[in-house]
Amino acid sequence: MNHDSSSRIVSRVKEWIAGAAPGAKLPSTRQLVAEYQASPVTVQKALRTLTAQGLIESRPGVGTFVRAYRTARPSDYGWQTAALRAAQTARPLNSAAMRSATNDVIAFHSGYPDRELLPERLVRAALTRAARGDAALSRPPAQGLPELQTWFAQELSTSTPVGVTPPQPSDVVVLPGSQSGLSSIFRGLVGHGQPLLVESPSYWGALLAAGQAGVNVIPVPSGPDGPDPEELDRAFEESGARLFYAQPNFANPTGAQWSAERGEEVLRIVQRHGAFLVEDDWAHDFGITAQSVPLAAKDDSGHVVYIRSLTKSVSPSIRIAAVIARGPARERIMGAQAAESMYVSGLLQAAALDVVTQPGWQTHLRGLSHQLQSRRDLLVTSLREHVPQAHLSHLPKGGLNLWLRMPDGFDVDQLTKDCEAAGVLIAAGTEWFPAEPEGPYIRLNYAGPNPGGFPEGARIIGAAVQAQLGL
């Protein structure tokens, strides 16, 4: 019989079940065949559908019965409280930036670029080619595919000045995303209970990784030009820290880019204290009116541990990043990484390498820069018109975000709730601070979907701000 016959039987038996008691026995297959004038195959198909829907259950050798619904007994997990003890970190395990959004909201909260800004054609073609190659069925080297190691090393080498030894492919460790790399770096180079200096504000994922690694996070104030050198030097002196985590180019959330002079001063401080600088170049591919200039390119003495991700610029489904470290530090990181994930999917590595070595990749990046500038400027213009109370200290030259200070005493958590109720998602700035926030901030992503909705989104934010201020 056809599919319609099976569906008809399912519908009729459901009506019968609705009037039957739990545990009631259904007519036999032979009876159902006769009643519905269908073949045994069609009847069995209908019964399988009802079983999958949880309406009936079969007891071999006995028959088929209406399934009895059991009231679920509440589970008691109280014993785990004593077993787990205190949580290792009080930070939430997920950021507002990771929330999924429905199509009927205006989303400024996300930490990722919209699908329209991704090289979709290149990604699909790369995945197809990778699936046909050896990478689909073979285990890659623990440190990564040699060709991908070479690409990452060459990318950093292009910024290396004369007189500085460029990195070698052997200095590269490929990672399953930068988040995993940060965790390995903090565990391998800092260690549980030891001090770690971080910019404040700083990337929430780095703060989460630090908390999970059990390190003692010490904030260093940072502004549009980078961290305060005197405060950084003092933090090293007082804490005895041997590692400073920072984002010199288009920092998340502020969008700040260090000046060349500030970068050199920070590097001198790090070297003087015999410490490491972990340079997170997360926005390398998101330059708008300036390009990322890695500080690691100026260091060949192993003080700078450089990490770069392709996840946001290639595809969130291709979680590939790399860390470039020289000397014993690389081995420490490699050991910590191996304990977490023994190797990175060769299929994803091959696909990522395919994308970034295609001629269309550079063409895509040029177009991406123009699109980001257009979106950034549209959102800034809309905010100036509708939310004049939000102060933008500087216009980011790259990255994905605007970092806005609200008036003193403003409740940004309440603002996020009010905006969400009106169909706009924003991110409160509190989660980007390693300690108490220095003021009320919000972060808005201008790389999100539907830029045509930016003016309306800004209008809704402005209305919520005015309501809270009583204007």
Regions found by a protein language model. Give the residues of each.
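Short beta-strand
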Residues: 57-58, 391-397
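PLP-dependent aminotransferase class I/II
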Residues: 305-385, 393-394
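Hydrophobic residues in well-ordered beta-strands that form the structural core
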Residues: 198, 219, 279, 352, ...
